[in-house]
Amino acid sequence: MAIQILNYIENKEKREESFDRVIQAIRDSLLIQRALLKVKELSDNNIHVFDYVEKDGGLYATVKSYSVLDYLQGILENEPYNYTLKCDTLNAISFGAPQRRERFIMVGLKKDLNIEYTYPEATFTEGSYRTVRDAISDIQDIEPGKEVTDSYFTLPPHPEAQGLEKELRGRCLHNHITTATRETALSRFKALKAGENFHDLSPELKTTYSNAERTQNTIYMRLKYDEPSGTVVNVRKSMWIHPELDRAISIREAARLQTFPDSFIFEGTKDSQYQQVGNAVPPFLAKAVAESIISILDQVQ
């Protein structure tokens, strides 16, 4: 590439032609650099290449495929990291959340600690699981706002509160907002009973969907008060419906299903707040795992 640049500087008459050659040389050099980085990535991660294929002017490496878990274990359990990994799937409902939400948890301890990690034991079982009613019934009569600026409400004292309500209820109610409901959506809300979803609607209420049969069962789901909810996602996009009222679930109601206390305030646009709630790990589940790790750290000290 240095030769092409020198020719470009010295040859004023053919500078345009030389410039094109310089650009091509730079492109070739970048392609080589990218290829070497890919080779380094394969080598660093012990990925076995068992064939190379030339196609469309490029060279493709065929590698053996394996799961993300195997990939992580292969790296973290060996030099230079040397972790002992424990993996399990925990359900938030077993730790006090009023929803069925499974999450894969991986905990790693340095091998030289010689300590065995044990996942936290469930504190709730079938028959004692918390429900949607436990989480949101006390704010049913508070009309949600429609804009982010409408999200502040003062909650009166509730000395009778107990269980989950007592754990989550605050003095102020933030983020209690929903989307404005259009006529078509409202007609669907009114048509659905607790536990029903989009597929239980009559054909005339499905006409705005190009492929209604492929719509997920979680769309237009009306929650059941006396059961745990399903996995909380972005309930605005899924159009989750209040168990008894013909309106969408508010951001705060979804946050309570996730076990966020009222004191936790979500910031950003309405869309962003709904997404933050849907993406989150339930604090009750996170707390259970964190406390189990703290007990390990106490042993180390």
Task: Give residue ranges: language-model regions.
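S-adenosyl-L-methionine-dependent DNA methyltransferase catalytic core
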Residues: 1-87, 94, 99-301
